[in-house]
Every structure is written in C-alpha cells, then in structure tokens.
Regions:
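Intrinsic low-complexity/IDR segments
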Residues: 1-35, 39, 44, 49, ...
Length: 185
C-alpha cells in the first residue's frame, strides 16, 4: 500500500474515532503494510485482519480493540503499543518487539509468539491465551515469575511451595535472572 493511501485511511479513521459519524473506520483487511511506519498512530478498533505488517513500526501505536486476526507481524516493532482487547487470534507475532506493550484482555488464541520480546509487557493470563504458542525463553520467564512470587508469598501453602522448589533450576534459566536475582531456597 502506498504511503499516501495509508495516510488518508488513518486520517479518515481519526475523524471516525471523534464522533463515529464523519470519516470512516479503518479497514485494512489483507493490506500489504510491510515496513509501514504506523508509530504513534491511533488505530483503535481498526480492522487489520490478514494484513501483512512484517517489519512495521508500530511503536506507541494505539491498537486497542483492533481486529488483527491472522495478521503477520513478523519482526514488527510494537514497543509501548496498546493492544488491549485486540483480537490477535491466529496472528504471527514471531520475533516481534512487545517491550512495554499492553496486551490486557487481548485474545492471543493460536498466536505464535516465538522469539518475541515480552519484557515489561502485560500478557493476559486468561483462557484467550491458553493456546498461544510461546517459546522456551518466554516460558522460562513466566515460570521464573510464578516460582519467585509463589515462594515469597505468605499466602501460598507448603504443598504449593514444595512443588515450586522442583522448578527452581528451570526458572533460573530466565534470561534476566541475574538482574532480577536468582531464586534460592
């Protein structure tokens, strides 16, 4: 898609967001947005299903409530993006940078997050993310946080703490364990 055409669609979407009567909701279904600069764009509620956003710059973009089902965001930069309540089901998010991104209540069912940077992001822990494809690095990151919190919790039972101690070695393989503090018992 040409830059001018994309700028026009974004401008019409901005108008639509203001009052819902002027402008037009962005519909970029299946669009080729490879390498597009959408940094800081307000794409709330936009339809990006099936779009190719490979290597797109979406830093600080507002994609809350967007439909991104089946989109390809391979190697896209979503640093600080708002993806809350977005439908990311079946989305290719491999090697994407989600540092500091808000994924609250996002639907990640069937999404592939292999190699994605999830540091400082808000990843949903609900049924909509149970079929998400995380890689070993991310699973170790989650495990580290669960084990560390569980062992430090005054509310966790001894039974739970005993089971968590069995996972310390794996949890300490978290890529930032040295910085955050290795788990010791």
């Amino acid at each position: 898609m040409k830059e001018e055409e994309l700028a026009l669609i974004i401008n019409e979407h901005k108008k639509w967001l203001l009052d819902g009567t002027t402008g037009r909701q962005a519909d970029l279904t299946g669009a080729d947005l490879t390498g597009a600069d959408l940094s800081g764009a307000n794409m709330t509620g936009a339809n990006l299903s099936g779009a190719d956003l490979t290597r797109a710059d979406l830093t600080g973009a507002d994609l809350s409530g967007a439909n991104m089902t089946g989109a390809d965001l391979t190697r896209a930069d979503l640093t600080g993006a708002d993806l809350s309540v977005a439908d990311l089901s079946g989305t290719n998010l491999t090697r994407v940078d989600l540092w500091g991104a808000n994924l609250t209540r996002a639907d990640l069912s069937g999404a592939d997050l292999g190699g994605a940077n999830l540091d400082y992001s808000c990843v949903p822990l609900w049924c909509g993310s149970l079929s998400t494809h995380f890689d070993d690095r991310q699973i170790k990151q989650f495990l580290y946080h669960v084990v560390k919190c569980g062992l430090n919790s005054k509310n966790a039972s001894e039974e739970v703490k005993t089971e968590l101690t069995k996972m310390i070695e794996l949890a300490n393989q978290f890529h930032r364990a040295g910085e955050c503090g290795r788990i010791e018992i």
